[in-house]
Amino acid sequence: MSLPLGVPRRAFSYDDALEDTAPMTPPPADLCANVLWKQPVIPERKYQELAKIEEGDANMNAPVITPSSSTESVNKVPVVKAKATHIIMNSLITKQTQESIQRFEQQAGLRDAGYTPHKGLTAEETKYHRVAEAVHKLKMQSGETTKDDKQTSSAQSTPSSTPHSSPKHKNRGWFSQGSSASITAPDFVAMEAGGDRLPSERWSFFGPKAIQKSTNDPGGFTIQSYKGAQKPSPMELMRAQATRMTEDPVTFKPPKMDIPVTEGRKQSSHSHNIKPRDLNVLTPTGF
């Protein structure tokens, strides 16, 4: 390996330096960044002109100018190549994606048979323009099915005589489909008449869901979107458990807890002996 210019090779024995108490010799004074920068280390067979200049023992300025211009000319080519390959790869990936989407469309039956392309577009371009349309169709189909399911379930859970008492599930939006159709004339008059209501309540025919006061929390507001089988509140659950326990304390056996219960319970006789440490295994995870 050839040493860079400005760094002379010096025979240095570390064993002798260990035995010798004198300090190690400092590097030469001419070893600095300027020397290495003026004559850079260039691999062999890279630039033939530089090799000729070095062999011909030319002046110091020539090596400085030549590598910069040559490196610029060399560096330009790979950058352009990389950009070109990047663009080509992007277009290829886009084309493959579009083709796979079209294949899926054909399999799912989302494509219209009688589609006529725009006059200014070729048939090849219209294939790519129709991808967003097909995705929109797919979303619409899935949205309609969920809407129908929710309507049937709400109609089953709340049997009613009038069609408007069962709340319909609609997407949020200002002018959503069927929002104006669901408002009857007396409802609209009642909304207008109630002047002391909130503006969101008064103009609730723009949005599908009206804000009403909740029954459990008198201070807060809840969105009443579904009035089917409502979940019982925790207070109601506790009351139901207490009534069940007072009715038949023998059948109701809650897991053993540290909280003392005032009601007396009969200790059912077990054939097997359970130590108190084993009750941790037997208690359900909800407690």
Swiss-Prot record:
First-tier enzyme category under EC: oxidoreductase
Biased composition (Low complexity): 152-165
A GO molecular-function annotation: oxidoreductase activity
Region of interest called Disordered, as start-end residue ranges on this chain: 139-179, 245-287
Signal peptide region: none
Localization, UniProt: Cytoplasm
GO cellular component, one term: cytoplasm
Claim: Zinc is one of the keywords in the record: no
This protein's UniProt keywords: Cytoplasm, NADP, Oxidoreductase
InterPro entries the UniProt entry points to: P33MONOX (IPR026759)
Keyword NADP attached: yes
Superkingdom field: Eukaryota
Assigned EC number: 1.-.-.-
Function: Potential NADPH-dependent oxidoreductase. May be involved in the regulation of neuronal survival, differentiation and axonal outgrowth.
Family, as annotated: Belongs to the P33MONOX family.
Name by which UniProt lists this protein: Putative monooxygenase p33MONOX
Organism: Gallus gallus (Chicken)
Lineage: Eukaryota, Metazoa, Chordata, Craniata, Vertebrata
Gene name per UniProt: P33MONOX
